[in-house]
């Protein structure tokens, strides 16, 4: 009977026996035949069942629910049940009735559905299969696909079938390896795109008579293992050279070989058996991923490692092996052993370009869409490759782009879980319709394709209506976007989440925020308009995407006197960009004054303390690639530091002591210096404040602030330009031309005016008020106190730092004294005013006083405090009386 069966039908019989063994049954029934038809994949029967949404997983589940699992003991020969025999006989008759003198998978399926009873029919009924429709579908396929019916098996498929029939000649290898060729036949491997050159190089090495062992060398994630998988797919598709016909690729699992080797010699014995089996079977090509692990594997005291066991076989040409490892590991483990290195022929696998990566992602898109049950927009696929290449610096294409695309799908899928059940059902129906439509077009079934297009439009209309209802329902709070599609914005959000770099599109709120950036920074930094404008322009340029992508966002030198806000502007910028001023990377360059301390920036060299700890600058930027880097007091650093900065400022990159390239392209480099302070002081005519200087402030009758005419810092634009040129000249004398030439802008800071100090005093008072608010206390400072603080804290040479000392001495110390001398409760008001001179109306002393107001305090707290005070007094009296007695 079986002589008329096609190779596909024979495979169905063999697969049905395998299914019986898997389920622990000693018979092959109609249900196992059904599973064999589905598992055959290439046959018409499998295609017809797939069209009816019948999958191997669903069918197995239903069958196991119906008949359960067997005892587990299965004989070597598994007989057919009477019903299964009858079905196979009916399959022969089905072929004759259709005028065909052979039996294919379609005839077996026709016989199965002709059998009115049986587990197979009940399973199909449970899965909702329309039997008449299925029969018509099979007949249509038979009529239109005569070539497919008679499709001969490839050499590799024949070889796999023969191995299954005769039994494997490599039992040890089968136990400790995975069959890549079988996965290729089953369609489990991802498509390999853009690796034709590398696959061709591997084939050339395999064609050699001796030392025919290619080793794929490349960075992690560039697709070394994919080259081996691509070769397996070429062999299966019969597109490889003739000498590879029928060859199988087996991936060796070194970990499982090592596992369980309790006694000396067990590991060596396993390796020897595998070598013998591969040498005896010329069709086997061994694939060893991470081949450097062979060196030292299993080498206990006095034993031989796996690499030395394999050396003789690798040189003879009968043991073909494809290895894969990274460049560093090849250099570290393989190259140091010349005898092992000469047995391998390196094949370098380079990182693909962005264009090739996009092609790879487009090839993988269907796999991700099937897994995540959604669709990917073409722009999202392109952006995944472009943004991953641009912003993820420490990994390689295509691996990082694939991970971005996968996580974007996962992100959208998780968001879709919040959708109503009806929407999920419609989205699933749309995915199924799109897949069926593509299959119909491939099979030239245009009538069904037209019906599916109409159904697709109907489903999309329902989805659009439901989306509109969701968007109008504010309680769900869903964003207005395509909820069934991964868009480029989703990819940008994944990149932003990984790196902290805002690469997504600028929202309306962020656009307004960027346009008003100067106003926001002016609220914190007083009197330095030119510096704020320059920094704001750089931020806007970077956020919109107009800056040079191969350089840092911007690089500045802040030059000017001490205490005028150079470091404060950097803190304000960090708080504006990241919400926290501690987010910036700050390095005090006075710590790098000596030559040997320069190494701390990039990490100590080998042999020195802290070699593996990384550099203070490089490690910080590696952790936070989007940040503000402040090099404070840069003129105090050793000159060799500036040599390190040249590469950062020009190319946005720096190599650390471990050889890693750190990406500085998304950092803003700010260097502060006090060079030029003397020039600014001289040109503006400012002199240090002395004790003989009279207070410049006066209060008029209405209580408004005024001041006496005194020398002012630079206000004239022509004078400011002159001072800027002089400061630049001094910087040129100190720094080398190649360093200054790489700086985007040198910003000269002004001296602070009296009014600037007045404004800064207000900011300091607000900070103190905020600290007291945390203790539920209210601070009210009289304008006369603010005048006093400004008078005491104003010094044109030393900037705002004397003001901080004045606030600490006159205000904070006085408040601390009052807080300790009198009880303070939540709601207490502290009023600070200036002590007036006796007998005058508007003259004040340099002393301040604090009045405590309990009017807003909860009366119950005051009562409890009074009771406690009386109780303490009573206890004190009693103690005194006891002492006297």
Swiss-Prot record:
One GO MF annotation is: ATP hydrolysis activity
Q: Where does the record place the region Disordered?
A: 864-885
- Cite a single GO BP annotation: cellular response to heat
Task: Alphabetically list the UniProt keywords.
Answer: ATP-binding, Chaperone, Chloroplast, Nucleotide-binding, Plastid, Repeat
- Region named Repeat 1: 5-70
Q: Name one GO cellular component term.
A: chloroplast
Q: Where on this chain does ATP bind?
A: 218-225, 560-567
Q: Where in the cell is it found?
A: Plastid, Chloroplast
InterPro entries in alphabetical order: AAA+_ATPase, ATPase_AAA_core, Clp_ATPase_C, Clp_N_dom_sf, Clp_R_dom, ClpA/B, ClpA/B_CS1, ClpA/B_CS2
One of the Pfam families matching this protein, by short name: AAA_lid_9
- Give all residue intervals belonging to the Clp R domain: 2-145
Stretch list, region Repeat 2: 80-145
Q: Does the keyword Chaperone apply?
A: yes
Domain of life assignment: Eukaryota
Q: Cite the PANTHER family for this sequence.
A: ATP-DEPENDENT CLP PROTEASE, CHAPERONE PROTEIN CLPC1, CHLOROPLASTIC-LIKE
Q: Provide the family line.
A: Belongs to the ClpA/ClpB family.
Tell me, in a sentence or two, what this protein's role is.
May interact with a ClpP-like protease involved in degradation of denatured proteins in the chloroplast.
Q: What is this protein called?
A: ATP-dependent Clp protease ATP-binding subunit ClpA homolog
Origin organism of this chain? Trieres chinensis (Marine centric diatom)
What gene makes this protein? Answer: clpC
């Amino acid at each position: 009977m079986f002589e008329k069966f096609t190779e596909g039908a024979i495979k169905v019989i063999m697969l049905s026996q395998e299914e019986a063994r898997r389920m622990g049954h000693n018979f092959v029934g109609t249900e196992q035949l059904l599973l064999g038809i589905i598992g055959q994949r290439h046959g018409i029967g499998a295609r017809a069942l797939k069209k009816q949404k019948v999958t191997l997983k669903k069918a197995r589940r239903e069958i196991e629910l119906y008949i359960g699992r067997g005892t587990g003991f299965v004989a070597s020969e598994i007989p057919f049940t009477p019903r299964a025999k009858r079905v196979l006989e009916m399959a022969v008759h089905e072929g004759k009735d259709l005028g065909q003198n052979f039996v294919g998978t379609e005839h077996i399926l026709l016989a199965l559905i002709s059998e009115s009873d049986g587990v197979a029919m009940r399973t199909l009924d449970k899965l909702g299969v329309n039997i008449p429709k299925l029969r018509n579908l099979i007949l249509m396929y038979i009529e239109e696909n005569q070539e497919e019916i008679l499709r001969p098996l490839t050499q590799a498929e024949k070889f796999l079938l023969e191995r299954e029939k005769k039994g494997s000649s490599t039992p040890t290898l089968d136990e400790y390896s995975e069959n890549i060729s079988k996965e290729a036949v089953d369609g489990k491997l991802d498509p390999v795109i853009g690796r034709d050159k590398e696959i061709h190089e591997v084939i050339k090495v395999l064609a050699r008579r001796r030392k025919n062992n290619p080793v794929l060398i490349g960075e992690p994630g560039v697709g070394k293992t994919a080259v081996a998988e691509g070769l397996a797919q070429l062999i299966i598709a019969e597109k490889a050279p003739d000498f590879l016909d029928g060859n199988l690729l087996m991936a060796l699992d070194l970990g499982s070989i090592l596992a369980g080797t309790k006694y000396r010699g067990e590991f060596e014995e396993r390796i020897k058996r595998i070598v013998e089996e591969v040498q005896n079977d010329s069709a086997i090509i061994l694939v060893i991923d991470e081949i450097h692990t062979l060196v030292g594997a299993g080498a206990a005291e006095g034993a031989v490692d796996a690499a030395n066991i394999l050396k003789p076989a690798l040189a003879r040409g009968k043991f073909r092996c494809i290895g894969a490892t990274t460049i560093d590991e090849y250099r570290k483990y393989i190259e140091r052993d010349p005898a092992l290195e000469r047995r391998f022929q390196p094949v370098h696998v380079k990182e693909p370009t962005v264009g090739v990566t996009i092609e790879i992602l487009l090839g993988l898109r269907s796999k991700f869409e099937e897994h995540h049950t959604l669709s990917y927009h073409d722009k999202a696929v392109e952006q995944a490759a472009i943004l991953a290449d641009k912003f993820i610096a420490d990994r390689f294409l295509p691996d990082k782009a694939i991970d971005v695309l996968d996580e974007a799908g996962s992100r959208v899928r998780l968001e879709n879980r919040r959708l109503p059940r009806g929407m999920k059902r419609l989205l699933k129906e749309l995915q199924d319709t799109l897949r069926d439509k593509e299959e119909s077009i491939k099979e030239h079934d245009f009538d069904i394709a037209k019906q599916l297009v109409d159904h697709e439009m109907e489903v999309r209309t329902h989805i659009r209506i439901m989306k509109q209802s969701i968007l109008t329902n504010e309680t769900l709070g869903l964003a207005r976007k395509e909820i069934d599609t991964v868009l480029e914005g989703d990819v940008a959000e994944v990149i932003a989440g990984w790196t902290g770099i805002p690469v997504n599109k600028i929202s309306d709120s962020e656009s307004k925020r960027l346009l008003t950036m100067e106003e926001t920074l002016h609220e914190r930094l007083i009197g330095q308009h030119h510096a704020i404008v320059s920094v704001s322009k750089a931020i806007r340029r970077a956020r919109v995407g107009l800056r040079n992508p191969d350089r840092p966002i911007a690089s500045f030198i802040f030059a000017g006197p001490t205490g005028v806000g150079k470091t404060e502007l950097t803190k304000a910028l960090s708080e504006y960009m990241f919400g926290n001023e501690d987010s910036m990377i700050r390095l005090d360059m006075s710590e790098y004054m000596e030559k040997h301390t320069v190494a701390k920036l990039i990490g100590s060299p080998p042999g020195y303390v802290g070699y593996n700890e990384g550099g203070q600058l490089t490690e910080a930027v590696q952790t936070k690639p989007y940040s503000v880097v402040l090099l404070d007091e840069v003129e105090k650093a050793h000159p060799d530091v500036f040599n390190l900065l040249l590469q950062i400022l020009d190319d946005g990159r720096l190599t650390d002591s471990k050889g890693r390239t750190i990406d500085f392209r998304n950092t803003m480099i700010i260097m502060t210096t006090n060079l030029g302070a003397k020039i600014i002081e001289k040109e503006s005519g400012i002199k240090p404040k002395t004790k003989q200087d009279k207070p410049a402030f006066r209060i008029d009758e209405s209580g408004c602030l005024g001041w006496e005419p005194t020398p002012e810092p630079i206000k004239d634009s022509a004078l400011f330009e002159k001072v800027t040129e002089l400061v630049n000249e001094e910087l040129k004398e100190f720094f080398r031309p190649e360093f200054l030439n790489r700086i985007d802008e040198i910003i000269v800071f002004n001296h602070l005016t009296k009014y600037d100090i007045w404004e800064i005093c207000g900011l300091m008072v607000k900070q103190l008020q905020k600290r007291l608010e945390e203790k539920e206390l209210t601070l009210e400072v009289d304008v006369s106190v603010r005048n006093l603080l400004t008078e005491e804290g104003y010094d044109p040479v030393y900037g705002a730092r004397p003001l901080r000392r004045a606030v600490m001495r006159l205000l904070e110390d006085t408040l601390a004294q009052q807080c300790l001398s009198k009880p303070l409760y939540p709601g207490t008001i502290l009023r600070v005013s200036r002590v007036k001179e006796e007998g005058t109306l508007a003259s004040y002393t340099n002393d301040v006083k604090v009045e405590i107001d309990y009017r807003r305090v909860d009366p119950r707290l005051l009562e409890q405090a009074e009771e406690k005070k009386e109780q303490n007094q009573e206890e004190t009296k009693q103690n005194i009386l006891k002492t006297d007695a």
